[in-house]
Curated annotation (Swiss-Prot):
Residues 1-14 have a biased composition (Basic residues). The lineage of its organism: Eukaryota, Fungi, Dikarya, Ascomycota, Saccharomycotina. The keyword rRNA processing applies. It is found in: Nucleus, Nucleolus. Pumilio repeats lie at residues 147-183, 204-239, 291-328, 340-375, 376-412, 513-549, 550-587. It comes from Yarrowia lipolytica (strain CLIB 122 / E 150). This is Nucleolar protein 9.
């Protein structure tokens, strides 16, 4: 007879044994009266063989929470499961003929799910359906779901699938609370109010906070609850902008993006809340801090799952209590050095999670607290701390909060460690040092020169860009990983370019050399940002022409790229007073009829005002000149007059009755402001009328290849340009 197909090998055998161990018979309970919890072995939690004992100790409250006990609400039968899976697919496709049809479908689904909600939210596929329904339900349907989940929130929050539904339900509920607060006719004391439901939920959660914040699923629910009770902004669960890390880690946000469920409109905003919410938040924070001893509190503070919630509790404490009991439990409430606190701080400075916790605390703690920690445990050890991978972020935060004298001491001490940091690829600390020195206006040039010296270069070296980036000879433009040394070298160079105009000018010369491919750099996820930093209108005009000639004919391709499209956006300002280049780029972009259909090309089209360029070109020129005027004013406030900075080099100024003029390499002149007629370009000895191209080989520039912008010798840098 046929034999059962089995996987061979010890790993497969071990996996089968594990599955058989977990394969237990679970009784299906059809109503809430039969609901019980099961332990890790599949048995009834607290059950005994003694028939006289019902398995529960009614004298002891359900606290602390046994994390091994997981809720079980039964299974759907095959027919129900198939029906709801099909419904989930229908909602995901969203191919309804009208909004009314969709609303009717949602109402029918909620009616069909009545009595089965707890089974649905704990099912892998059906929980996605319930989350979609929660997002699409009206206010009355949200209230009804709150009522169904009431009494089960603690257990549902700990479940892998239902926890997402609880989070979404809380966000939808917060929007309803705001409506009730803003409605003058609403009775806030009504038992049907969403405010009462939230207060009941907060009271149920209060006694289990210590256990829930250590659960990988419930911790996210607690974060949402704390943000709502505190009236803080609720970040999007998928966005990486703003304070999104308060709600989810980067890994968690990525996982949520992979689920095809759109964010609720209630995300990314704060809500008006009743005063009772502040009282509930204070009760949670004070109750949590009173039950904890310093050792337990510190363990939670460095826990990978619990640490973000403890940070949020400390932030919430600042608005509910002036005494800061939780902060004073984790850290010693004394001015003197404490041995246990010293060991704890040492661990924080050496640990990834701990350093993030300490950084967050120092950002929002009172200045006296920051100065005390720095004075007792860090001031004498700056030289060692800057060498650590994780302590650098803490040092950065200290430099933002400490007095000027302490900041100067850190910079002076850390400068001597720059060679060690570069040699060991700890370039994060190098970037921090560059940033803070510039912000403090203290030895910023000295720090930049020390960094360049470590890379065996200086601000006048034409090979500066190549020496700092250290491009791989075999594959110089391979994608960078998050921890790639190439990425961090690129970030260091960006910081140097930001800090020093001399480094900017020298690095741009490197871009125009034949050693780098600017097209590939523009399409690189890291180097494209470096290009954006370098594309400034203060760059010498001749160097700008060289760069623009390098990308000639590639603009459409760059505009369609997710990274290079940002470079194309920067070209609008980069081409200051180079109107013919702007017009040439615009013509190249509008020649591609499908560019607007591309996601990135559409953004470039909008930023270059190409609709105006096609329909009302005069308006486009007005926009262009307004941009130039704004840029000139902006750079003048920075002490960089763009006309003199960008047009004077490498020639010299000539003053006369006609105003300031620049002598070009070829001997021709043009006015500083640009224009037509008498102020136009003059060619060689004969010149050319009205700003045309000169015909003399010696003094002027020739049109070559039918006016494509190259002279007869093929030198693309010697290109004659006419300002419109």
């Amino acid at each position: 007879m046929p034999r059962e197909v089995k996987k061979r090998g010890r790993r497969a055998a071990a996996k089968r044994a594990e599955e058989e161990k977990e394969d237990v018979d679970l009784k299906v309970y059809e109503n809430d009266e039969d609901y019980v919890t099961f332990d890790a072995d599949g048995g009834v939690a607290g059950g005994h063989d003694d028939e006289e004992n019902d398995g529960y100790d009614n004298e002891t409250p359900y606290n602390p929470l046994d994390l091994k006990q997981m809720p079980f609400f039964g299974f759907l039968d095959d027919q129900e499961s198939e029906y709801f899976k099909t419904a989930e697919s229908t909602l995901a496709v969203d191919a309804f003929g009208s909004p009314e049809e969709k609303l009717g479908f949602i109402s029918g689904l909620l009616d069909e799910a009545r009595g089965k909600e707890l089974k649905l939210v704990t099912n892998q596929i059906c929980s996605k359906l319930m989350e979609r329904l929660i997002l699409l339900a009206n206010d009355e349907q949200i209230r009804a779901l709150f009522e169904v989940f009431s009494g089960y929130f603690v257990d549902l929050s700990r479940h892998k699938y239902s926890s997402h539904c609880v989070e979404t339900l809380l966000v939808r509920g917060a929007a309803i609370v705001e409506k009730e607060v803003l409605d003058p006719n609403f009775d806030g004391d009504s038992e049907d109010s969403m405010e009462k439901r939230f207060l009941t939920l907060a009271n149920d959660m209060k006694d289990y906070i210590q256990d829930l914040i250590s659960n990988p699923y419930a911790s996210h629910v607690i974060r949402v609850l704390l943000l709502i009770l505190g009236g803080q902004t609720l970040p999007s669960p998928t966005s990486s902008e703003g304070n999104s890390s308060v709600l989810r880690s980067k890994k968690s946000r990525t996982a949520r993006r992979n689920i095809d469920i759109k964010d609720s409109e209630e995300n990314d905003r704060a809500y008006q809340i009743p005063g009772a919410f502040h009282d509930a938040l204070e009760a949670i924070v004070s109750g949590f801090s009173k039950r904890l001893k310093p050792t337990a509190a510190r363990e939670l503070a460095i826990g990978q799952v619990s640490s973000p919630v403890v940070q949020l509790l400390i932030d919430s404490e600042a608005t509910t209590s002036e005494q800061r009991p939780l902060l004073n439990t984790i850290f010693a409430d004394t001015e003197d050095r404490d041995s246990s606190e010293e060991a704890f701080v040492e661990h924080l400075l050496s640990d990834a999670v701990g350093s993030h916790f300490l950084q967050n605390v120092l950002q929002k703690a009172p200045e006296a607290f920051v100065e005390r920690l720095y004075r007792l445990y860090m001031s004498q050890r700056v030289q060692k701390l800057v060498r650590r991978d994780y302590a650098g972020f803490v040092i950065e935060t200290c430099m933002q909060r400490l007095p000027e004298a302490d900041v100067h001491h850190i910079i002076d001490t850390a400068m001597g460690e720059i060679p060690y940091l570069v040699e060991n690829n700890n370039l994060t600390m190098v970037r921090i040092l560059l940033t803070r020195a510039a912000a403090a206006n203290y030895k910023a040039t000295d720090v930049a020169n020390a960094v360049l010296k470590t890379f065996d270069t200086d601000s006048t070296d034409p090979k500066l860009l190549q020496k700092v980036l250290q491009l791989d000879e075999k594959n110089p433009y391979k994608p960078h990983e998050a921890s790639s040394p190439g990425l961090h070298r690129c970030l260091v160079l960006q910081q140097l370019v930001e800090a020093s105009p001399e480094v900017l000018a020298t690095a741009f010369v490197g871009l125009n050399s034949g050693d780098v491919d600017v097209i590939k750099m523009a399409k690189h996820q890291s180097y494209s940002r470096l290009l954006e930093k370098c594309l400034r209108p203060s760059i010498n005009t001749i160097e700008r022409r060289k760069f623009l000639n390098k990308i000639n004919g590639q603009c459409v391709d760059l505009a369609r790229d997710p990274f290079a499209s940002h470079v194309m956006d920067r070209l609008w300002n980069f081409t200051y007073k180079m109107n013919n280049f702007r017009e040439k780029i615009a013509n190249e972009l509008v020649a591609d009829e499908d560019l607007k259909e591309n996601t990135y090309g559409k953004a470039v089209w909008r930023n270059w005002s190409l609709d105006k360029f096609l329909r009302r070109k005069s308006d486009w020129w007005v926009t262009l000149h307004a941009t130039d005027d704004a840029l000139a004013k902006e750079y003048e406030e920075l002490g960089i007059p763009l006309d003199a900075k960008s047009l004077a080099n490498p020639g010299q100024k000539r003053f006369g009755r006609g105003g300031a003029r620049i002598i070009t390499r070829g001997g021709g002149t043009f006015p500083r402001g640009g224009g037509r007629g008498r102020g136009g370009f003059r060619g060689g000895r004969g010149g050319a009328p009205r700003g045309g191209f000169g015909g003399s080989d010696r003094g002027g520039f020739k049109r070559a290849n039918g006016g494509d912008g190259e002279d007869a010798s093929g030198d693309r840098s010697r290109k004659k340009v006419r300002n419109e």
